Design a protein with these regions (language model features):
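Short acidic, glycine/serine/threonine-rich loops at helix termini
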Residues: 110, 142-149, 173, 214-218, ...
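General beta-strand structural signal in soluble alpha/beta enzymes
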Residues: 130-134, 158-162, 205, 228-231, ...
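Rossmann-like adenosine-cofactor binding region
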Residues: 234-334, 339
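Buried hydrophobic packing segments
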Residues: 74-77, 147, 183-191, 215, ...
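N-terminal ligand-binding/catalytic initiation module
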Residues: 1-174, 408-413
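Adenosine-phosphate binding glycine-rich loop
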Residues: 190, 302-416
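Glycine-rich phosphate/diphosphate-binding loop of Rossmann-like nucleotide-binding domains
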Residues: 163-166, 171-282
Length: 416
């Protein structure tokens, strides 16, 4: 674990049991959710909210609706979220929640009734200065809207506790772009430190959803050639690089028509490699933006052999532990997701600030603040991860930077 050497040099953290205290959440809320489906049958699901740590601010983290959700997963995600939020430099603690409810195949009415039933219990544990949830897997704008609406109804308070809301009721501009843009901003800082940039670089991106789309958009804006996107069916390969027109068409096709990438490739006469991931294509920069454990040791070896310079994670933990070890051993610039994809939660923090001030910032204002936050995160990673030879272990840097921020706050507040 990258924290052990640091803890060995700074015994005061060990003397006060900071790591042990961080490994256990402040509290766990678990309850049943009973709701009625379209056939009039009563359904029962389990729901959880892990309030992990609020040493530096209110609990902050997404709600996940997926059959795989259980307490063990959410406790781990809450732990990771605490470190990620600390890296943003914004006053946010860490938390995570969700349910084993599966929104796939459910009608809008069923999803609404479930969200309202869930909030009838959860609302009493939330608040702008207590716990601020957001979306995650299975929880998009629709679900956030249903939950936020029920929260207002039950609390008789117009304060919008959720982030990721629609613009019409307190959401922030730039929230859809934030994670993808932030990933590219972080990679840009990594490259700049080595006197390099995105211009004329070949970039491989996995995924074709929100994060991948906006990572591609920003990389192209910086002069890069985006040569791949992917989905669960396979990989789009465009050796000459996607154009802005192609990307706009793809956004329409994926976000509005809900189409598959292979069908988009047929329409635009683009190469589609069925069943393949994008990491075999020679590139300078790789941005895994799809899902967990999508890039394994064999993929890492392919990328390294083909001369990859930089890997920055847009998804949460897309690289396996073995893949990360290969990148670090090869001296590849590698950014873990808790640092490079923190732009999403950072912009959620900016949404909280706008709500508190009853203001709405412009697109350019939010983008500028996001860019500065990603620069600050990079600087903190360098500060805590730089080696004597000038290289930077961004994994160690991110873990130590996040830990120090939380641990110092906990030390100042005593044993509680």
């Amino acid at each position: 674990m990258s924290l052990w050497p640091f803890l060995g040099k700074h015994p005061r953290y060990r003397e006060h049991g900071l790591l042990e205290r961080l490994c256990e959440p402040d509290r766990v809320i678990q309850f049943r959710v009973a709701w009625v489906d379209d056939k009039g049958q009563t359904q029962v699901n389990r729901a959880f909210r892990v309030q992990h740590n609020m040493a530096i601010g209110p609990y902050k983290g997404g709600m996940r609706f997926h059959p795989s959700v259980n307490l063990s997963i959410l406790k781990f995600l809450g732990f990771e979220q605490t470190f990620k939020n600390a890296l943003t430099t914004l006053p946010m603690g860490g938390g995570k929640g969700g349910s084993d409810f599966d929104p796939k195949g459910k009608s809008d009415g069923e999803v609404m009734r479930f969200c309202q039933a869930l909030m009838s219990e959860l609302y009493r544990h939330l608040g702008a200065d207590t716990d601020v949830p957001a979306g995650d897997i299975g929880v998009g704008a629709r679900e956030v809207g249903f939950m936020a609406g029920m929260m207002k109804k039950l609390s008789n308070n117009a304060g919008s506790v959720f982030t990721g809301k629609g613009i019409a009721y307190g959401g922030s501009l730039m929230r859809p772009e934030a994670t993808g843009y932030g990933t590219v901003y972080f990679a840009q800082e990594m490259l700049r430190r080595k006197q390099m940039g995105f211009e004329d670089r070949r970039v491989s991106i996995s995924g074709s959803g929100n994060v991948a789309q906006y990572a591609a958009d920003k990389a192209m804006e910086l002069g890069a050639k985006v040569v791949t996107l992917s989905d669960s069916d396979g990989t789009l390969v465009c050796e000459g690089g996607l154009t802005h027109g192609m990307l706009q068409d793809l956004m329409e096709f994926k976000n509005v028509q809900r189409g598959r990438l292979k069908d988009f490739c047929k329409q635009h006469k683009l190469k589609f490699e069925a069943g393949k991931r994008p990491w075999h294509v020679p590139v300078d920069i790789a941005l895994p933006c799809a899902t967990q454990n999508e890039l394994d040791a064999a993929d890492a070896k392919h990328l390294i052999a083909n001369g990859v310079v930089c890997v920055a994670e847009g998804a949460n933990m897309p690289s396996t532990l073995e893949a990360v070890e290969h990148f670090l051993a090869a001296g590849t610039l590698y950014a873990p997701g808790k640092a490079s994809n923190a732009g999403g939660v950072a912009t959620s923090g900016l949404e909280m600030s706008q709500n508190a001030m009853r203001l709405s910032w412009t697109h350019s204002e939010v983008d500028l603040r996001l860019h500065e936050i990603m620069k600050d995160i990079h600087g903190n990673c360098v500060r805590h991860g730089e080696r004597k030879d000038g290289t930077v272990n961004y994994v160690e840097g991110a873990n130590v930077a996040g830990f120090v921020k939380i641990a110092d706050a906990m030390l100042a507040q005593g044993v509680c």
